């Protein structure tokens, strides 16, 4: 019932290392098939289940099944890139079902890629030239953080589960226009009011006149405060962390999540981080917010770069031609 409420555009079924546990993925697939959703299904689990999946989602009955290599083929090994590519292919083939998109397909001869996916493609290309990096895209509705980096040897010894080399997180509550009230709530209304007062303007007045593209000095200052919160929160959520665990032999340290300590470059793209006056200082906050020392965030050595021409998403699409 919950799946029908969500009305997903695509379902990914995974689970079970190759030649390991089979039953859970099969049971989930049968339940999904019984819902008669008529949407693409991607299977990226135990290789032994592939034939079973073809029987559950028969092509001759109009089912759209994509079978891809296991995302978790063996313990402590991730293999996400083949699955990522197939999801992109499924998106392209089915995007024309969205209102108005059939006309876009008629005009476009190349690939159609959602903006976060396009920015990730560009980020992976930049990695080949620059090395370890993260890219931040603060928009009106979301804040996306893309990282392509390998964990340090020190952190690798502490990791309790693997992380992909290329990772993207999309924070749906950290947009600086559509979701501005959620960012205000994240900062704290009283704290934000005081920050605005220190900069010589009224928070209430700035929010009353607030628009998608700031025009006045007050609006620009307010957007910068919201953007700083979005950037820091997105980085904290994306980054892994160290954690203490206690056992018979005493306390030990483990690492969970994505290690960003090797990142050499922090890149800003999107409307806010390509246009705001203090965009570089805002991004620099990522390297200063790790007060506990337990977050695996970039250090002060990281350099700040800005996509001044706002072309990373376009370059990501062009790279797929």
Predicted regions span which residues?
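Glycine-rich phosphate-binding loop of actin/hexokinase-like ATP-binding domains
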Residues: 124, 128-198, 277-301
């Amino acid at each position: 019932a919950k799946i029908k409420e969500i009305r997903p555009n695509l379902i990914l079924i995974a689970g079970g290392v190759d030649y390991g546990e089979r039953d859970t993925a099969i049971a989930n697939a049968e339940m999904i098939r019984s819902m008669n959703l008529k949407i693409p299904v991607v299977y990226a689990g135990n290789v032994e289940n592939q034939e079973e999946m073809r029987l559950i989602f028969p092509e001759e009955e109009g089912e759209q099944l994509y079978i891809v290599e296991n995302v978790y083929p063996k313990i402590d090994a991730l293999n996400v890139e083949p699955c990522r590519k197939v999801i992109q292919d499924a998106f392209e083939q089915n995007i024309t079902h969205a209102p108005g998109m059939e006309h876009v397909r008629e005009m476009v001869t190349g690939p159609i890629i959602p903006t976060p996916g396009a920015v990730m493609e560009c980020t992976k290309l930049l990695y080949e030239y620059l090395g370890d990096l993260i890219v931040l895209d603060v928009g009106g509705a979301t804040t996306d953080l893309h990282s392509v980096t390998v964990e340090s040897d020190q952190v690798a010894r502490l990791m309790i589960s693997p992380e992909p080399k290329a990772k993207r997180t999309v924070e749906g509550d950290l947009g600086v226009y559509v979701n501005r009230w959620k960012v205000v709530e994240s900062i704290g209304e009283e704290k934000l009011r005081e920050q605005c007062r220190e900069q010589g303007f009224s928070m209430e007045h700035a929010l009353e006149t607030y628009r998608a593209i700031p025009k006045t000095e007050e609006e620009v200052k307010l957007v910068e405060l919201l953007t700083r919160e979005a950037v820091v929160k997105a980085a904290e959520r994306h980054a892994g962390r160290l954690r203490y665990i206690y056992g018979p032999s005493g306390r030990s340290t483990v690492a969970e999540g994505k290690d960003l300590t090797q990142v050499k470059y922090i890149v800003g793209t999107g409307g806010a981080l390509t246009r705001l006056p203090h965009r570089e200082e805002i991004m620099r906050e990522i390297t200063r917010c790790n007060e506990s020392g337990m977050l695996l965030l970039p250090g002060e050595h990281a350099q700040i770069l800005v996509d001044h021409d706002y072309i990373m998403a376009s370059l990501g699409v062009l790279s797929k031609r």
